[in-house]
Amino acid sequence: MTKIYDKIFPKEPEFEDIKILHNSVRLSWIEPNVLLGKNNYNFDNFLPETKDLLVKLENGKSPLQKINCLNEIFKKITNIIQFNNQNDEFIGVDDSLPIFQYAVIKAQPIRLFSNYKYLNMYMNKELRNGPNDQLVTQIYVVGEFIKNVTYENFYGISKEQFNRNCTEAINNDMLSYIK
């Protein structure tokens, strides 16, 4: 699998990956309430674990390894929602997507789009059932959100505050390379 994978999966991030990564850095200042409209979620241990899983997604060679990482991420998201809502209601994309967006922005994966493309092209029919296909679609949706986000996509943020926070985040990131 490794020999084939090395030929079909790009060694370097594609242009779309770089756009997503750049905007993730720009958005590194966000807090959950800005995406969710509420601040009652407990994210203890979620971000480090999710970041580790996104690294596993990046390093996974087979579509099955990558899908398993996504399934683990969404199990964690489901647990957060159930824990914080204290109910057993059905959890849909509207509930999980903002938390996944938050996790991806904070984790800043290097090749999110490349992983989407790889899964979309090489995932076999047995894996391509409803839930797995939805996971792959959510990667795409999150990438598009991050690339195209404006202040209007967030709760309680003015255009000026959004621009100021994004500029500060980029400046801080650039300074971290100098130090």
Predicted features, each with a name:
Residues 6, 17, 44, 52, ...:
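Acidic-enriched, low-complexity/disordered segments with a strong bias for Aspartate over Glutamate
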Residues 134-179:
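C-terminal regulatory/linker segments that are acidic, Ser/Thr- and Pro-rich
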Residues 14-17, 117, 156:
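Flexible domain-boundary/linker segments
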Residues 56-152:
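Alpha-helical catalytic/interaction cores of small GTPase-regulatory modules
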Residues 1-75:
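Catalytic and GAP-homology cores of small GTPase regulators
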Residues 21-29, 82, 124-129, 144, ...:
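Short alpha-helical interface elements
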